[in-house]
């Protein structure tokens, strides 16, 4: 243990470190089989009962096999009596029916796979029915006659208070067959009853087969007992004794189909001094657990990690046998009641099982036992927490440096978070020969010099759960130094340390006598104060004078402008843009056209008419702007009818509308329009997007422009309607186990909010979503981007939120508010102050504000990652100021859960740092088309095409990319495989729309910046982008 601690401590000083256990790697340890349930390994059963041996294992990627043994000998299929023993290899269970004496002993199972094996033993003990009446509390008059006869003919006088001499062959004759079945061992002889037999004449036993089920006799009689008399059955009729039987217990002799122990109860005992008495076979009583009070008897709390099986027991007694009803949070549970994720509740006879429990299964459960006499309840408080398969986490800021005086007490606190049971110790790091570490020749590594604090007499260590406290009493200068808290479990170890500083006693000089009187105000102080007051007065007078002059000039200028005129009309003119000599765009506008605002004066009469029209309609402040009409795309306003709003942003709205193309043809469309609070800049942006739609043309995977409403009145841009909303929300709707992220109205930005499905438009989900569907989505987007690239259009904002899902799940690329036409240059340089989505931006765009088609390829790789994670948020654990530095150092996102190897290769090739090494959209379309058309066997066998595609883009130097390391470990996954998300999702959903971050993130390397309120991490402006330093050394790369 000490050597292992020293090896772990040798990693580093004054920082949290982790150390993995030596021996099995985590890869092997996680794949060793483990049992799913905690099984009962000892069974005490009666003859004729049934047993189920459970060796089921938890879900794993590695197939496991089970073998069954009887007394350490393998049970082969040809040696098994199939009528008695049945194997269930799928559920890894063994069913043993019709228990007889020969089944008593050891049964075991062994589960194994390629990584290891586990075993479980079961002990079976057959309890004789008559052994129950050996308890001294049961009066001898209540013992069934068949048991007395069995003990007599088996020559086992097990009860000394029974008069065996009074038991005759006539009384025992009707129990002959039952006596054989009840025997723990075969009787040495079969009793012979009748006049022709002697009293104890016997016939040798020749053969004993497997005992069958005891005969069920429906005739149940009453018994009349006399004081101190033997048991003699008295019949109500003259029926043959063999046709009736005496029953003293309420024993259910039918086969128990449940996996729980059967209840047996006896009638009320008869006192020895009782007279002639009639006994009832059973007595009605209400359900109860430990008492007969119909009140809440139990209130249990069950807390366990996710993935375990939760079992709530509600074993109740009573007659008639109670019926159990389960409730969760006050609602009755049925077999049709659904759990989170599509799982079902498992109802046993006396218990409720919740397999693979998740956090959503937490809540208040209670069971109610009912019969016709009464009821009883039992309550359970269930808490399910997520598992953490990792070494312990030492909570930061708990263990802090201490500074105390000599002879005082120093106290250090350490708190650990761990799913597994952690082990915590305290050590002191010693400095020997000027160094805290030394080189261990046998281990060939540096280790710390340390001493465990348990060996110190004046140190006390106290553990309470996951918290530990180190207390050092009567500290001295020798105790000054570094103390560390070490915590470990089966997955590794973590360390945190703090420094203890001991203060010596210092001499304090105290002044005595009266304090001298000193004049605090000197002549220079008076002069300085006077000058300051004069300057403040002068500044105040100057400010008042400035405001008065400004108001006067403003009023004069307004009067001059309104002489004969009251307003100006502004026309939005779109014309061809003249090219500069350097053939480079000079601002943010697209190159083929330019948008200008031309003002023309209007008369008072025309201005008054416009003012009345504005007040009586939906026109906004922008009503004085008129956009030149385009006859090719113009749509009459009278043919549009707005239905309801689909989405909105800070200055824009998207409405669902109906467009009447002809008298008899009416279609549903989407209309983009500006809000009343919009300004001139937003109008120009909407006009720019409209012109981009006109330049692009039509393609199946690009949102189609239907027309626009220009001229006098608000500007409407009419596009086709995609009823399933955007791709991000469509994919998140297929997530079965998590809440969909909702966006509050306070998080709206200047961008138009992506359309989200409302109650009026239900998303048509794909019933069985497979990897082929996801690759099909990626192929459609690549086709649309290939079309835009052929048109020399740079999208600049390619993301899942800007891809819409139409009829038949056809994807449409939309939102061209940031798109630019680069017919002349093949690139575009950003010079304005617009906002940009940095999570989807390429390195060259973050570094130099340069955008090319290859920049869209980078964004396509991020969108592909969103598709494979069903709408996950990229870089959820990296703060935005650190993103650029991490990307420059070679970091790329890890492969999504169960992502095919070929798809992740494609992502990594899109994230190449050099532009020329990224594939074109034409190459991406061909590659995805190859994946969709080839069969699974062909994909695995056609590595030549796959290797050639990626080898052409491999770099000659630099760190190993995630693609190369992933290629060595990942296996091919067929596209027909279902998309199985883990019970606890690996890819977080964070809100993608945030405002500009104005607060620097806290200096905490362990903090996960996912939807952090202190860090707005989606969109930045060029001013705030300067906070991303270009020097890689100044940024700390987080650990992954």
UniProtKB/Swiss-Prot annotation:
Its cofactor is Mg(2+). The active site is at residue 797. It is a single-pass type I membrane protein. Keywords: ATP-binding, Developmental protein, Disulfide bond, Glycoprotein, Immunoglobulin domain, Kinase, Magnesium, Membrane, Metal-binding, Nucleotide-binding, Phosphoprotein, Receptor, Repeat, Signal, Transferase, Transmembrane, Transmembrane helix, Tyrosine-protein kinase. It comes from the Eukaryota. SMART domains: IG (SM00409), IGc2 (SM00408), TyrKc (SM00219). Belongs to the protein kinase superfamily. Tyr protein kinase family. Fibroblast growth factor receptor subfamily. It comes from Caenorhabditis elegans. Disulfide bonds join 55-109, 314-367, 414-485. This is Myoblast growth factor receptor egl-15. It is found in: Membrane. Receptor tyrosine kinase required for larval development. May phosphorylate adapter protein soc-1 which in turn may result in the recruitment and/or activation of phosphatase ptp-2. May activate the Ras/MAPK kinase signaling pathway which includes sem-5, sos-1, let-60/Ras, lin-45/Raf, mek-2 and mpk-1. Acts in the hypodermis to regulate axon growth and fluid homeostasis. Activates protein degradation in muscles. Probably following interaction with ligand let-756, negatively regulates membrane protrusion from body wall muscles during larval development. The modification Phosphotyrosine is found at residue 828. Residues 1-19 form the signal peptide. Residues 234-267, 952-984, 1021-1040 are annotated as: Disordered. Residues 20-525 are extracellular. PROSITE patterns: IG_LIKE, PROTEIN_KINASE_ATP, PROTEIN_KINASE_DOM, PROTEIN_KINASE_TYR.
């Amino acid at each position: 243990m000490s050597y292992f601690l020293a090896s772990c401590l040798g990693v580093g000083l004054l920082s949290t470190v982790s150390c993995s256990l030596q021996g099995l790697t985590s890869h092997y340890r996680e794949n060793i089989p483990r049992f799913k349930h905690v099984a009962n390994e000892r069974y005490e059963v009666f003859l004729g009962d049934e047993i189920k041996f459970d060796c089921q294992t938890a879900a794993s990627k590695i197939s496991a096999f089970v073998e069954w043994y009887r007394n350490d000998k393998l049970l082969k299929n040809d040696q098994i009596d199939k009528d008695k023993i049945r194997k269930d290899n799928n559920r890894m269970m063994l069913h043993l029916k019709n228990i007889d004496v020969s089944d008593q002993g050891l049964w075991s199972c062994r589960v194994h796979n390629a990584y290891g094996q586990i075993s479980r033993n079961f002990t079976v003990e057959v309890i004789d029915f008559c052994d129950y009446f050996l308890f001294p509390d049961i009066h001898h008059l209540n013992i069934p006659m068949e048991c007395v006869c069995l003990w007599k003919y088996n020559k086992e006088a097990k009860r000394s208070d029974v008069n065996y001499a009074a038991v005759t062959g006539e009384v025992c004759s009707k129990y002959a067959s039952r006596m054989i079945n009840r025997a723990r061992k075969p009787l040495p002889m079969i009793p012979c009853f009748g006049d022709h037999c002697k009293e104890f004449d016997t016939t040798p036993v020749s053969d004993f087969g497997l005992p069958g089920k005891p005969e069920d006799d429906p005739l149940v009689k009453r018994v009349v007992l006399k004081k101190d008399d033997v048991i003699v059955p008295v019949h109500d009729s003259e029926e043959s004794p063999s046709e009736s039987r005496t029953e003293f217990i309420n024993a259910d002799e039918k086969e128990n189909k449940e996996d729980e122990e059967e209840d047996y109860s006896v009638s009320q005992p008869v006192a020895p001094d009782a007279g002639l008495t009639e006994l009832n076979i059973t007595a009605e009583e209400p359900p109860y657990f430990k008492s007969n009070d119909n009140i809440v008897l139990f209130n249990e709390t069950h807390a366990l990690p996710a993935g375990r099986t939760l079992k709530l027991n509600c074993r109740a007694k009573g007659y008639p046998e109670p019926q159990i009803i389960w409730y969760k949070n006050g609602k009755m549970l049925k077999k049709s009641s659904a759990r989170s994720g599509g799982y079902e509740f498992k109802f046993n006879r006396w218990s409720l099982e919740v397999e693979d429990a998740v956090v959503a299964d937490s809540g208040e459960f209670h069971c109610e036992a009912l019969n016709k006499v009464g009821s009883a309840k039992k309550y359970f408080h269930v808490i399910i927490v997520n598992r953490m398969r990792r070494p312990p986490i030492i909570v930061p800021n708990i263990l802090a440096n201490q500074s105390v005086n000599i002879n005082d007490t120093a106290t250090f606190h350490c708190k650990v978070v761990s799913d597994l049971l952690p082990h915590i110790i305290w050590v002191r790091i010693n400095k020997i020969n000027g160094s805290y570490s030394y080189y261990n020749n046998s281990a060939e590594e540096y280790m710390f010099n340390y001493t465990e604090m348990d060996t110190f007499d004046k140190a006390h260590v106290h553990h309470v759960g996951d918290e530990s406290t180190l207390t050092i009493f009567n500290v001295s200068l020798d105790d000054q130094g570094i103390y560390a808290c070490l915590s470990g479990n089966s997955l590794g170890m973590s360390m945190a340390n703090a420094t203890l500083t001991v203060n010596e006693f210092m001499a304090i000089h105290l002044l005595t006598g009266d304090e001298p009187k000193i004049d605090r105000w000197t002549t220079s102080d008076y002069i300085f104060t006077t000058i300051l007051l004069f300057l403040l007065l002068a500044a105040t007078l100057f400010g008042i004078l400035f405001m008065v002059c400004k108001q006067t000039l403003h009023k004069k200028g307004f009067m001059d402008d309104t002489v004969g005129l009251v307003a100006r009309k502004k026309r939005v003119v779109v014309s061809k843009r003249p090219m500069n000599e350097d053939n480079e765009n000079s601002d943010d506008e697209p190159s083929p056209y330019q948008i200008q605002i031309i003002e023309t004066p209007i008369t008072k009469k025309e201005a008054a008419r416009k003012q009345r029209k504005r007040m009586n309609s939906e026109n906004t402040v922008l009503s004085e702007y008129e956009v030149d009409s385009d006859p090719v795309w113009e749509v009459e306003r009278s043919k549009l009818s707005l239905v309801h709003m689909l989405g909105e942003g800070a200055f824009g709205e998207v409405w669902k509308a109906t467009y009447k193309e002809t008298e008899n043809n009416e279609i549903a469309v989407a209309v983009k329009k500006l809000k009343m609070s919009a300004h001139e800049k937003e109008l120009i942006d909407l006009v720019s997007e409209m012109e981009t739609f006109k330049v692009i043309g039509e393609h199946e995977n690009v949102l189609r422009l239907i027309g626009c409403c220009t001229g006098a009145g608000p500007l409407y841009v009419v596009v086709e309607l995609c009823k399933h909303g955007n791709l991000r929300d469509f994919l998140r709707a297929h997530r079965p186990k998590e809440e969909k992220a909702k966006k509050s109205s306070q998080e709206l930005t200047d961008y138009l909010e992506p359309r989200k499905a409302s109650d009026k438009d239900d998303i048509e989900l794909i019933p069985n979503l497979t990897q082929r569907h996801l690759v099909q989505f990626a192929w459609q987007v690549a086709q649309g981007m290939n079309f835009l690239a052929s048109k020399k259009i740079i999208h600049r904002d390619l993301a899942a939120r800007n891809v819409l899902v139409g009829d038949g799940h056809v994807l449409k690329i939309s939102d061209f508010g940031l798109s630019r036409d680069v017919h002349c240059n093949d690139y575009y340089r950003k010079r304005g102050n617009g906002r940009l989505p940095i999570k989807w931006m390429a390195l060259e765009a973050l570094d130099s504000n340069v955008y090319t088609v290859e920049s869209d390829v980078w964004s396509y790789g991020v969108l592909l990652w969103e598709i494979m994670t069903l709408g996950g948020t990229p870089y959820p654990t990296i703060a935005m100021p650190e993103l650029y530095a991490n990307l420059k150092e070679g970091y790329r996102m890890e492969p999504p859960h169960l992502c095919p190897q070929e798809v992740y290769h494609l992502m990594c090739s899109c994230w190449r740092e050099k532009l020329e090494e990224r594939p074109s959209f034409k190459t991406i379309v061909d590659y995805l088309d190859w994946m969709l058309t080839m069969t699974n066997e062909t994909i695995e066998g056609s590595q030549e095409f796959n290797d050639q595609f990626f080898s052409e883009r491999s770099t000659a130097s630099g760190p190993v990319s995630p693609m190369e390391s992933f290629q060595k470990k990942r296996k091919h996954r067929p596209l027909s495989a279902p998309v199985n998300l883990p019970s606890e999702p690996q890819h977080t959903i964070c809100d993608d729309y945030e405002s500009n971050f104005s607060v620097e993130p806290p200096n905490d390397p362990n903090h996960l910046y996912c939807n952090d309120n202190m860090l707005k991490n989606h969109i930045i402006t060029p001013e705030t982008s300067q906070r991303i330093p270009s020097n890689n050394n100044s940024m700390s790369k987080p650990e992954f």
